[in-house]
From Swiss-Prot:
This is Snaclec echicetin subunit alpha. Echicetin itself inhibits aggregation of washed platelets induced by vWF, thrombin or alboaggregin-A. However, when complexed with the pentameric plasma immunoglobulin Mkappa (IgMkappa), echicetin binds specifically to GPIb and activates platelets. This is caused by P-selectin expression and activation of alpha-IIb/beta-3 as well as tyrosine phosphorylation of several signal transduction molecules, including p53/56(LYN), p64, p72(SYK), p70 to p90, and p120. In vivo, it induces thrombocytopenia when injected into mice, probably accounting of activation of platelets rather than inhibition. It comes from Echis carinatus sochureki (Saw-scaled viper). Gene3D superfamilies: Mannose-Binding Protein A, subunit A. One of its GO terms (cellular component) is extracellular region. PANTHER family: MANNOSE, PHOSPHOLIPASE, LECTIN RECEPTOR RELATED. Belongs to the snaclec family.
């Protein structure tokens, strides 16, 4: 599609592909090997729909993996999550098991809702990259 590498899908000036089973950090590093490559970001409803359809098309229905990494991560300090209690005090991770700092799309929501999970799990992931020159 639109000069993307074989097997990749074109959308609004970039190329996208689903890959299998890495932790969030491994997946981001893997995506970095392509020009402008990163885990996919979702900035609009139209893009969310494109990504959901891409995953549904590429991830076998028989696959046991029902979650897919996206490029969203809580970058707050390691011992605190980015959420606050209603009185504005911080939530400390020692009370949250496991730490949930990276986000997936889940088959149960037809790959349309963002869900925070432990970054060390291994899931399939979607890379976004510039069109190869």
């Amino acid at each position: 599609d639109q000069d993307c590498l074989s097997g990749w899908s074109f959308y609004e000036g970039h190329c996208y592909q689903l890959f299998r089973l890495k932790t969030w950090d491994e997946a981001e590093k893997y995506c970095n090997q392509w020009d402008g490559g990163h885990l996919v970001s979702i900035e609009s409803n139209a893009k969310a729909e494109f990504v959901a359809q891409l995953i549904s098309r590429k991830l076998p229905k028989s696959a046991i993996e029902d979650r897919v990494w996206i490029g969203l991560r809580d970058r707050s300090k390691r011992e605190q999550c980015g959420h606050l209690w209603t009185d504005n005090s911080f939530v400390h991770y020692e009370h949250v098991v496991p730490p949930t700092k990276c986000f997936v799309l889940e088959r149960q929501t037809e790959f349309r809702k963002w869900i925070a999970v432990n970054c060390e799990f291994k899931f399939p992931f979607v890379c976004k990259a510039k069109i190869p020159r």
